[in-house]
Amino acid sequence: MIVSYQDMSAEPELANILQGLADETSTHKDVIYHVQRNQNARKSLAPTELLLNMTLLVTAGSETISSVLVTFMYNLCIHRDVYERLATMIRITFADPSDITLQELEGLVYFDACIKEALRIFPPVSSNLPREVPAKGAQVGPHFLPGGMLVSVAPWAAVRSKDNFHLPNEYHPERWLRNHPEHGWDPAFENDKLSASTPFGAGPKQCMGQNLSYYEIRLIVAHLLWVFDFELETEGVEGEKNRLWSLDPHFGLLRSFQTLNRPDLYIRFQERAGI
């Protein structure tokens, strides 16, 4: 009865929200407004489908990006050799932050390796992404999976497994430079199974916005590296809170509810002298 009552109470509010999103006179036309008016769509979405898609868009379109940015910045702060190399690269490549473009950033192989390693070591969606086995079933290695079964891989377990990665709990962008030895490939990572890191999912239903995610991460971090010098806060209350990121259970545990429930991160920023 309690669940039924909650559902009944939510329905009028949901109807009001959807009506507001469909308001033709509104000056703010968001993505749901345009989805509902797509003339090429086979049919409009039902209220429940709209609600599920709004939840997905908010989670995938904002929460994951902010998680990647925070974890990337954390790893740059604690791996000063990576920070110095990447900051020097950005500052030499671009004479002014206004010169920073996606086209130029895409050519920075080491920068991409740093991003991929940040996505690996702290996958923004660290809980399972279920997939349904086709009706005829599927053979996965020695195992036959019957049709209709839901299967998934735990991203955090996959990327932290020694079966898949050498030094799995350490941040090493070099592992992603196998095809670019001139940029510092380390043979110690020869046997890494890079395909085990799937931060955007895998197969035909992987995240359709992953390219946009890479664009946003490249642009934001490149501008931060060009304009600022920064380091992790290690003193006081903020420094104490930053210790949660070490994954040392003595300082507390990270939690994940579909996406990473990241703790606060405290960084000291100082504008570079002479710019």
Predicted regions and their residues:
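Active-site-adjacent bridging/hinge elements
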Residues: 41-47, 182, 186-199
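C-terminal, well-structured subdomains that either form a transmembrane helix-short loop-helix hairpin
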Residues: 49, 53-56, 62, 139-144, ...
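Short, small-residue alpha-helix embedded
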Residues: 64-77, 220
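Cytochrome P450 heme-binding "Cys pocket" and the immediately downstream C-terminal segment
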Residues: 80-83, 192-193, 206, 210-256
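Conserved cytochrome P450 K-helix/beta-meander segment immediately N-terminal to the heme-binding cysteine loop
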Residues: 153-187
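C-terminal helix/juxtamembrane-tail motif
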Residues: 257-275
